[in-house]
């Protein structure tokens, strides 16, 4: 009864039965959906995968297993029937049709003829759809997705064709050749059976030649030039379906009579002058083949520079400067820096100081202090290094750790590590459970011959988890093996980052190093949160010397050439000896460094000649030469500028501070030897050295504080970051000084130094501050002179009415030792500072009035004597009360000569004799006054003028202070 009832359901739905009144259309819809759900309960079912074969130019696809869909709703109409098969994919030349809805049988066929040469196989997705719950219902249910893979069966429709319409070879008489030349035919059919050439045949009869199934033609007897100069033979080819070539090819063999082959007209020693650009190495070279039967020539020019630095002449700037020069992103952490107080973990390692190369002999490692590298490297980071490594010692080699981050105590878990194992480079990265809780990639393996070739190579590991890419010498390498692992369980155990070995903190009686590295490392860095671009990677490892070809456009036709990434090896290949000769004459050496590493570069030229099928037909000796790179002219870097100046205390306290090097100049010169003009008269050429200015870059300038570090509570050195950024420089600041670094021109460094300022919030306790600048090029290879600067503070001196002020006019003894040439800055200072002579006269008048006001008879007599001698210089008399008197004195005016100073000293001595009687009551004040006078700092001599030439201005302030200015 149940099947019968189910069969009535679609009919009832079609007639609208059950849509009683009062419910409206909404009730009908709900009931209809309910009935549909009860009828069409199941989805169709098909196989999960199908394999098919279709013959080329046919439309029938033979599937295994056959295309049949089943539905558990059968035999219910519509719900248990199959209405369609749908193919998912774009522009697929197939369609699926339903042959029987009830049985679910279908057929897959091609829409149009299939061409095997266009595509050999197809893969797509197919699904089956039932007919829903009724004819009006669109809610068909679909099966799961099945994968269909179809292979196209080839038809032998193409005939073989030869790559060349004709071939030509030259042979020497009297020789039997295993192979004179090789002909080659191709077939455009897609299958191996019909696309491969199985046989070649010589069509021409009665010729002394034979051909094998690979197309190699040989002579069956010794050929004679006198008998026949040239042979012309026709050759055909057969594919593996025995279909012959559509057209035969012509082979022409020339017979040449029977010399010593080799390269001619080359020089063993080649001198290279730095800065001379691209210099040809073999301007006249040519190959003598002795008329050998040469079909092709391969020449390899190799520049051997493995013994120089890290494999070739590269820039020797510091790693930070190189990163900045190449445009690398900021945040690089140097794991093998130069040993210093701040980076002392490399102090115990073996190092080649000239190139900062660290050598590991399998017995030492270095612990990176905590805080140098962040604990979380994020999902993006970059590791870079130079590595030189040979075969691992021992039969079963252990892991050789380059970089390792492991548990410091208790356990022996490796969080991330980079190591070499059996000449394979392996990078380990274990995620924590708080970062991931699934089975994730953990070990990435690379197998490269260069890892153990004992040569320098540049490695960059770019991590964008879970993808890890290796760059070696600029080329990209994907890992050949990636293994997965579970994340590390969380713990509170601290981690230890090491270089050259891995720290084993657990599972041993005493924590120690293990898995030591054997080899050399340099420039090992890590950059958390960033990946390096291909452009920056190429820049960092680029060689500055190599082989070059002048005028590539002028190379002859048919010349193939190839450079290795460092341009130390050039391979040229061609079938024309003349073109090869001309191309080789254009090969040159270039060194783009302004100051290259002097010395020998060995050069080898090897040749491989093909003689119509033979591997090597004649033996050409190698060319062994060498390039002598001459010593570059060493620059003399000189820093020039004002070495000493004074500024008021208020300027030190201001927000801008004091500019330390407003006029500094950086000049680089070299000595050039020139012959004198009297060579004709004397017959000899006396040589004289002439200094010429040269332009080059600098990589750092250090400003050191002398006489003790800066006190950050009251003084500092300041430089706006914008001044550095717009000139592509960086800087570090500390209490010991300021360091500006980055590869830039001398003019850039000048401009930055012009803006360096010194501030002091409490200059009253400061007399002088001394600084020293030293600049460098090529990481200290060339250094400048040590430029010293002394900055002094001008102080205000405050005295009371009970103190003697006459000793203020005494010239300080250190003034005699200060001599400086006139500069613009000193002229500006002298224009706003009163002369010492004017100050002396005013102070004398003030003391005279002071003594008269005291009413001391003895002082009055002394002052009357003094007034008689200085009456001509007196300008005004002023009375003051017993309040304190502040006199601002600028001692920076220069004296005309020593005579003026002596006159002033005589006047002071006479004043002191006149007041000697009353000075006993203020002897204590004199001592304190002398201490204030010593704190005034060093001053410069100024030119003194007479009182009539230098009118003064005196003003009273509310505190009883007299400011005296010129």
From Swiss-Prot:
It comes from Mus musculus (Mouse). Restricted to the brain. In the cerebral cortex, found in the somas and neuropil of all layers. Expressed at highest levels in neurons of cortical layers 5 and 6 and, at lower levels, in neurons of the upper layers. Highly expressed in Purkinje cells. Also found in a few scattered interneurons throughout the granule cell layer and occasionally in neurons in the molecular layer (at protein level). Present throughout all cortical layers, highest levels in GABAergic neurons (based on morphology and distribution pattern). Proteolytically processed under normal cellular conditions. A primary zeta-cleavage generates a large extracellular (soluble) N-terminal domain (sAlc) and a short C-terminal transmembrane fragment (CTF1). A secondary cleavage catalyzed by gamma-secretase within the transmembrane domain releases the beta-Alc-gamma chain in the extracellular milieu and produces an intracellular fragment (AlcICD). This processing is strongly suppressed in the tripartite complex formed with APBA2 and APP, which seems to prevent the association with PSEN1. It comes from the Eukaryota. This is Calsyntenin-2. Postsynaptic adhesion molecule that binds to presynaptic neurexins to mediate synapse formation, and which is involved in learning and memory. Promotes synapse development by acting as a cell adhesion molecule at the postsynaptic membrane, which associates with neurexin-alpha at the presynaptic membrane. One of its GO terms (cellular component) is glutamatergic synapse. Residues 890-966 are annotated as: Disordered. InterPro entries: Cadherin-like_dom, Cadherin-like_sf, CLSTN_C, ConA-like_dom_sf. Residues 943-960 have a biased composition (Polar residues). Residues 857-966 are cytoplasmic. Keywords: Calcium, Cell adhesion, Cell membrane, Cell projection, Endoplasmic reticulum, Glycoprotein, Golgi apparatus, Membrane, Postsynaptic cell membrane, Repeat, Signal, Synapse, Transmembrane, Transmembrane helix. The gene is Clstn2. The keyword Signal applies. One of its GO terms (molecular function) is calcium ion binding. Residues 46-162, 163-282 form the Cadherin domain. Pfam families: Cadherin, CLSTN_C. It is a single-pass type I membrane protein. Disruption phenotype: Mice show a deficit of GABAergic interneurons, associated with hyperactivity, deficient spatial memory and social behavior. Mice show a selective reduction in functional inhibitory synapses, associated with a selective reduction of parvalbumin interneurons in hippocampus and cortex. In neurons, a reduction of symmetric (inhibitory) synaptic density, length of synaptic contacts and postsynaptic density is observed. Moreover, cortical neurons are characterized by the predominance of the simplified type of synapses with the emergence of negative curvature of the synaptic zone.
